[in-house]
């Protein structure tokens, strides 16, 4: 075998390994589009907090231009949002001083959902963010996601003291067109 043939064989082997690695990160879930939080919702004619999967809403209404996210079967997450800004109050159209956000994936029914969180990511003054990493339940170890995430909800949240998940600002819209 010539050196050129060996080189071509190595390149093909490397490409094959890369494709296999990519196949292992196939998406479990995708989200395309987002809904900003409205802190109050009507229940039997009475305003109540708009709590989603046990997570309280931010104190004001928020809106989001664009939100896309992909969650891998291995717990990887990539989420990108644009224009997540306040939709009410004296500081309307701003990020209200928030400098970091994180994502929370909820799997299961509303009264018994399992929550998985991303690490905090930068949140710029235009309301843009890009979350990349691995979901966790304890803030340290990679989460083991269920093979199927029933009733999935993706929340973009504030970051509290010590990096703890805070209130929710926006929710992702599940993309049912995934393969």
Regions found by a protein language model. Give the residues of each.
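N-terminal segment immediately downstream of the Sec signal-peptide cleavage site
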Residues: 22-73, 176-179
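A short, structured loop/turn motif at beta-sheet edges
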Residues: 72-76, 108-111
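Extended, low-complexity, turn-rich repeat/linker tracts enriched in Gly/Pro/Ser/Thr and Asp/Glu
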Residues: 85-91
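Short coil-to-beta strand junction motifs in C2/discoidin
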Residues: 92-101
């Amino acid at each position: 075998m010539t050196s050129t043939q060996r080189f071509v064989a190595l390149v093909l082997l490397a490409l094959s390994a890369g494709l296999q690695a990519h196949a292992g990160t196939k998406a479990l879930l995708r989200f395309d589009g987002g809904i900003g939080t409205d802190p109050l919702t009507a229940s039997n004619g009475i305003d109540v907090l708009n709590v989603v999967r046990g997570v309280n809403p931010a104190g004001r209404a928020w809106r989001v231009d664009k939100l896309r996210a992909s969650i891998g079967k291995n717990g990887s997450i990539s989420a990108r949002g644009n224009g997540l800004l306040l939709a009410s109050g004296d500081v309307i159209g701003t990020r209200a001083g928030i400098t970091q956000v994180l994502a929370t994936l909820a799997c299961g029914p509303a009264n018994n959902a399992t929550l998985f969180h991303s690490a905090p990511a930068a949140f710029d003054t235009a309301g843009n963010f890009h979350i990349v990493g691995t979901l966790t339940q304890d803030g340290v170890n990679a989460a083991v996601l269920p093979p199927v995430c029933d009733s999935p909800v993706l929340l973009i949240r504030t970051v509290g003291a010590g990096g703890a998940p805070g209130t929710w600002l926006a929710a992702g819209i599940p993309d049912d067109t995934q393969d």
